[in-house]
Protein backbone atom coordinates (compact mmCIF):
# COMPACT_ATOMS: atom_id res chain seq x y z
CA UNK A 1 0.00 0.00 0.00
CA UNK A 2 1.39 3.37 -1.01
CA UNK A 3 0.95 6.43 1.28
CA UNK A 4 -0.49 9.32 -0.69
CA UNK A 5 -0.34 11.90 2.12
CA UNK A 6 -3.23 14.04 3.27
CA UNK A 7 -4.34 14.62 -0.31
CA UNK A 8 -5.67 11.08 -0.46
CA UNK A 9 -7.96 11.65 2.54
CA UNK A 10 -11.49 12.90 2.21
CA UNK A 11 -12.11 16.36 3.78
CA UNK A 12 -13.85 14.72 6.77
CA UNK A 13 -10.83 12.45 7.27
CA UNK A 14 -8.41 15.40 7.19
CA UNK A 15 -10.56 17.24 9.73
CA UNK A 16 -10.55 14.20 12.03
CA UNK A 17 -6.78 13.84 11.71
CA UNK A 18 -6.19 17.52 12.54
CA UNK A 19 -8.59 17.18 15.49
CA UNK A 20 -6.69 14.16 16.82
CA UNK A 21 -3.36 15.98 16.49
CA UNK A 22 -4.72 19.02 18.35
CA UNK A 23 -6.17 16.79 21.06
CA UNK A 24 -2.81 15.05 21.48
CA UNK A 25 -0.98 18.38 21.71
CA UNK A 26 -3.25 19.71 24.46
CA UNK A 27 -2.03 16.92 26.72
CA UNK A 28 1.59 18.03 26.20
CA UNK A 29 1.21 21.14 28.35
CA UNK A 30 1.60 19.31 31.62
CA UNK A 31 -0.49 19.52 34.77
CA UNK A 32 -1.11 23.03 36.05
CA UNK A 33 0.18 24.79 32.93
CA UNK A 34 -3.27 26.29 32.32
CA UNK A 35 -3.16 28.18 35.64
CA UNK A 36 -2.43 31.91 35.39
CA UNK A 37 1.03 32.94 36.56
CA UNK A 38 0.88 34.07 40.18
CA UNK A 39 1.84 37.74 40.55
CA UNK A 40 5.42 38.10 41.71
CA UNK A 41 5.96 39.22 45.27
CA UNK A 42 9.10 40.31 47.03
CA UNK A 43 9.67 39.99 50.73
CA UNK A 44 8.23 43.20 52.10
CA UNK A 45 7.26 44.40 55.53
CA UNK A 46 5.23 41.54 56.94
CA UNK A 47 1.60 42.31 57.72
CA UNK A 48 -0.20 40.43 60.45
CA UNK A 49 -3.15 38.15 59.87
CA UNK A 50 -5.37 35.68 61.74
CA UNK A 51 -3.30 32.94 63.33
CA UNK A 52 -0.14 35.00 63.86
CA UNK A 53 1.17 35.22 67.40
CA UNK A 54 2.74 38.44 68.71
CA UNK A 55 4.52 39.50 71.86
CA UNK A 56 3.49 42.95 73.10
CA UNK A 57 5.81 44.58 75.61
CA UNK A 58 4.64 47.72 77.38
CA UNK A 59 7.74 48.93 79.19
CA UNK A 60 7.19 49.38 82.92
CA UNK A 61 3.72 47.77 82.76
CA UNK A 62 3.86 44.03 83.48
CA UNK A 63 0.06 43.61 83.32
CA UNK A 64 -0.01 45.03 79.78
CA UNK A 65 2.76 42.76 78.51
CA UNK A 66 2.23 39.30 77.04
CA UNK A 67 1.81 37.01 74.05
CA UNK A 68 -1.33 37.31 71.96
CA UNK A 69 -2.75 35.47 68.96
CA UNK A 70 -4.49 37.39 66.17
CA UNK A 71 -8.04 36.00 66.17
CA UNK A 72 -10.25 35.24 63.17
CA UNK A 73 -11.67 38.76 63.20
CA UNK A 74 -8.13 40.17 62.93
CA UNK A 75 -7.80 41.54 66.46
CA UNK A 76 -5.81 40.83 69.60
CA UNK A 77 -7.42 41.03 73.04
CA UNK A 78 -5.29 43.12 75.39
CA UNK A 79 -5.96 43.15 79.13
CA UNK A 80 -7.72 46.33 80.33
CA UNK A 81 -7.88 47.62 76.74
CA UNK A 82 -9.98 45.06 74.87
CA UNK A 83 -9.80 44.31 71.17
CA UNK A 84 -7.12 46.05 69.12
CA UNK A 85 -7.11 45.61 65.33
CA UNK A 86 -3.92 43.81 64.18
CA UNK A 87 -4.68 42.24 60.77
CA UNK A 88 -3.10 44.13 57.90
CA UNK A 89 -0.67 45.99 60.17
CA UNK A 90 3.10 45.65 60.39
CA UNK A 91 4.61 45.12 63.83
CA UNK A 92 5.62 48.80 64.03
CA UNK A 93 2.08 49.88 63.07
CA UNK A 94 0.72 47.57 65.78
CA UNK A 95 3.05 49.22 68.32
CA UNK A 96 1.57 52.61 67.42
CA UNK A 97 -2.00 51.26 67.55
CA UNK A 98 -1.50 49.67 70.99
CA UNK A 99 0.15 52.83 72.36
CA UNK A 100 -2.77 54.91 71.08
CA UNK A 101 -5.29 52.53 72.71
CA UNK A 102 -3.42 52.76 76.03
CA UNK A 103 -3.42 56.58 75.86
CA UNK A 104 -7.10 56.73 74.87
CA UNK A 105 -8.06 54.52 77.81
CA UNK A 106 -6.01 56.71 80.20
CA UNK A 107 -4.13 53.58 81.26
CA UNK A 108 -0.61 54.83 80.56
CA UNK A 109 0.31 58.49 80.04
CA UNK A 110 3.23 58.04 77.63
CA UNK A 111 3.41 54.33 76.75
CA UNK A 112 6.49 52.80 75.20
CA UNK A 113 5.35 49.70 73.31
CA UNK A 114 7.27 47.04 71.38
CA UNK A 115 5.66 44.35 69.24
CA UNK A 116 7.38 41.33 67.76
CA UNK A 117 6.07 38.39 65.78
CA UNK A 118 6.84 35.13 67.54
CA UNK A 119 4.86 32.71 65.32
CA UNK A 120 3.71 33.15 61.73
CA UNK A 121 0.68 31.62 60.05
CA UNK A 122 1.65 28.21 58.65
CA UNK A 123 2.04 27.23 55.01
CA UNK A 124 0.71 23.99 53.54
CA UNK A 125 2.77 21.86 51.16
CA UNK A 126 0.73 19.23 49.30
CA UNK A 127 1.02 16.85 46.38
CA UNK A 128 4.23 15.24 45.18
CA UNK A 129 6.47 15.90 48.19
CA UNK A 130 7.80 13.25 50.54
CA UNK A 131 6.09 14.66 53.65
CA UNK A 132 3.02 16.71 52.71
CA UNK A 133 1.54 18.77 55.52
CA UNK A 134 1.45 22.01 57.48
CA UNK A 135 4.76 23.75 58.16
CA UNK A 136 5.83 26.95 59.91
CA UNK A 137 6.47 29.92 57.62
CA UNK A 138 9.87 31.60 57.69
CA UNK A 139 10.49 35.03 56.16
CA UNK A 140 12.16 34.83 52.73
CA UNK A 141 10.83 31.34 51.99
CA UNK A 142 10.45 30.32 48.34
CA UNK A 143 8.52 27.47 46.72
CA UNK A 144 11.66 25.32 46.56
CA UNK A 145 12.57 25.94 50.22
CA UNK A 146 8.98 25.06 51.20
CA UNK A 147 9.35 21.81 49.23
CA UNK A 148 12.63 21.13 51.06
CA UNK A 149 10.84 21.56 54.39
CA UNK A 150 8.24 19.07 53.10
CA UNK A 151 10.92 16.43 52.57
CA UNK A 152 11.78 17.25 48.95
CA UNK A 153 10.21 16.25 45.65
CA UNK A 154 9.05 12.69 45.01
CA UNK A 155 10.40 11.01 41.88
CA UNK A 156 7.07 11.73 40.15
CA UNK A 157 7.04 15.48 40.86
CA UNK A 158 6.93 18.32 38.35
CA UNK A 159 9.89 20.29 39.70
CA UNK A 160 9.71 23.47 37.60
CA UNK A 161 6.56 25.06 39.01
CA UNK A 162 3.74 24.60 41.52
CA UNK A 163 0.18 25.74 42.10
CA UNK A 164 -0.19 28.25 44.91
CA UNK A 165 -3.47 29.28 46.54
CA UNK A 166 -3.08 32.61 48.35
CA UNK A 167 -5.55 34.82 50.20
CA UNK A 168 -5.37 38.43 49.00
CA UNK A 169 -7.75 41.00 50.50
CA UNK A 170 -10.00 38.23 51.81
CA UNK A 171 -10.26 36.38 48.48
CA UNK A 172 -8.44 33.20 47.49
CA UNK A 173 -6.51 33.35 44.22
CA UNK A 174 -4.78 30.41 42.55
CA UNK A 175 -1.85 30.65 40.21
CA UNK A 176 1.27 28.97 38.90
CA UNK A 177 4.51 29.85 40.68
CA UNK A 178 8.11 29.12 39.72
CA UNK A 179 10.55 27.42 42.08
CA UNK A 180 12.02 30.77 43.13
CA UNK A 181 8.69 32.53 43.77
CA UNK A 182 8.35 33.84 47.30
CA UNK A 183 5.86 32.16 49.60
CA UNK A 184 3.59 34.06 51.97
CA UNK A 185 2.10 32.89 55.26
CA UNK A 186 -1.10 30.91 54.75
CA UNK A 187 -0.15 29.82 51.21
CA UNK A 188 -1.23 26.36 50.03
CA UNK A 189 1.43 24.98 47.68
CA UNK A 190 0.60 21.97 45.51
CA UNK A 191 3.30 20.07 43.63
CA UNK A 192 1.91 18.31 40.56
CA UNK A 193 2.51 14.74 39.46
CA UNK A 194 4.52 14.48 36.25
CA UNK A 195 2.95 12.76 33.26
CA UNK A 196 5.22 10.15 31.78
Language-model segments: which ranges?
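Sec-dependent signal peptide recognition
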Residues: 14-20
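Ser/Thr/Pro/Gly-biased, low-complexity, turn-/loop-rich segments
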Residues: 2-10, 21, 28-196
